[in-house]
Amino acid sequence: MLNVGDKVKMNDKYYVSDVNKEKIFTVTAGPQEVGGTLCVWLEDYRGCYAVDGLSKVN
């Protein structure tokens, strides 16, 4: 489970643009269900992102 403050990267489950492929994001809010999908909000990312499309980094 992801928590506020966790560092994450987008994995290959969904399409990821070249700009975001290696970028490390910080979880700012969530998780919450959006349209039936569990999502979190990320710093410097517009909108929320599906939890299963993210991998936690150390």
Give the label of every model feature segment.
Residues K7-V57:
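Basic/aromatic-rich interaction segments and small domains that mediate binding to polyanionic partners
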